[in-house]
Amino acid sequence: GQVIKEFIPDSREIKDEAVVYLLRDMMRSVVDGGTGGSLRWKYKFYAPAAGKTGTTNSKADAWFVGYTPQLTLGVWVGIDDPSVSLGEKQYGSSAALPIFAETIHEIYKNGSYSYLNESVQLDNKVNWYRPPGIIEVEICAETYDKATPTCPLNREIYLKDYRPRESCQKHAN
C-alpha cells in the first residue's frame, strides 16, 4: 500500500517509576485474578505478565493487550462494521485472550524474537524492578485500613507517602 500520512507520536518519558510500578501492578491483577485470569489457570502462562481485556458495548470488538518485562502483544478480534456483533458471549477474555495466550506461548517456546534486526532472548523468570518509594503493607481485607492483629489480612503495595495510616477500628478489640 501507499503511505498517505506518517504520524510521529509526541512521546516523553514518565519520571515517576513508582507510579508506573503501581499501574503495572494493577494490570498484573487483571491477569492474576481478574478478567484475564484464564491466562494463568486455563492457558498455564506463568511468566510475570500484566494486561487489559476490553469489549465494546455492542460486542463488535474484543481485545486483550498484555505484556511481560520483555514483550508487548495486543490482539483485536472484531468486524469493521460496528453494527455486526461478534456474538453474545464474545468478550476480550473469551475471544481475544485465547489468541494472545497461544501466541505468547509460541513466542516464549521459541526463546527469542527479532526486533529492529536484533535478536531478543526471552526468559520467563525476568521480573519487573520494584523502584524505591514502593512499600508493601498489611491491610484489613474488610476496611482497607492498616491491619490490626485480629484483622483478616491482605497485602497491598503503596507509594510510601500514601500508605494507610489509620488502624482498622472494626477489628481493634
Predicted regions and their residues:
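Active-site core of glycosidic bond-cleaving carbohydrate-active enzymes
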Residues: 17-18, 22, 30, 34, ...
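Extended, non-catalytic substrate-recognition/exosite surfaces adjacent to catalytic cores, especially
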Residues: 1-31
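Soluble, non-transmembrane domains of envelope/secretory-pathway proteins that act on or interact
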Residues: 2-11, 42-44, 48-173
